[in-house]
Amino acid sequence: MPPSTSRLRGEILIVLALSLGMSALYAIVGFSRRLSIETPLNEQQATINRSLADESIFDLVYQLLGIASAWAPVLLVGFLLWSSQKPHLGALGWSAPRWPDLWWGVGLAALIGIPGLGVYVAGVQSGLTVQVVPTALEQYWWTIPVLLLRALTAGVVEETIAVGYLYRRLSQLAWSPVAIILTQAILRGAYHLYQGAGAFVGNVAMGLIFGWYYHRTGRLAPLIAAHTLIDAVAFVGYPLVSADVVQTLGFAG
């Protein structure tokens, strides 16, 4: 028996309150606070990955705990949409991976990442975007593996919930594909608003492209691959780029 409309709405609110919806609220409040201070946006900084303890072992433990907790909403929506028939998570766009998914992911990463860098630079130069620090982690033996794991986590969490889960549940509420894609895109922009208005615009555009792709294919793997690749390049590549290039691109050094 399919869930009632009121139950679906309540479920969506709970899932978002435990994940990206709450992140969006924090980002909106954070952006409002940034606007309230005298320092221009493009002179402020937003650090994505930071050290959580002075001691290497405790920093690692905290990082892994943070990653594990981020996966909890994914497990929740997987539990809610699990089917006894294969593919068990087909309602979320999860099915057996295929090699073309990887190549589509690379293509989508290039389509989003290259123009996205331009949007970021333009946003910083115009004063609409803060200087982003992709990582401020100390250099330990575990730093790169943790950064890659964080990139994968961001890809899985955001695409599973913002795209796969919302598309399924909002479709059950008889929303049109256009309304669903717009909602997904605005949500994606909202929880990136802590980086400034430029990041909001860029991520809304990313959400529109990803939403359209999912509407046409119903496959989540290429989106996860693309998102993971974009974040992995930013997180791992940032410390390897010279200070001059970092400053030219508008990243905080």
Predicted regions and their residues:
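Interfacial segments of alpha-helical transmembrane regions
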Residues: 91-114
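N-terminal, membrane-interfacial amphipathic/helix-forming hydrophobic leader that caps
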Residues: 1-89, 235-253
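Residue-level signature of transmembrane alpha-helical entry/exit and packing/kink sites
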Residues: 7-15, 59-70, 100-105, 143-147, ...
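Helix-boundary and loop/linker segments of multi-pass membrane transporters
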Residues: 2-8, 51-52, 93-98, 133-142, ...
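Transmembrane helix-loop-helix hairpins at the membrane interface
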Residues: 20-24, 113-117, 121-253
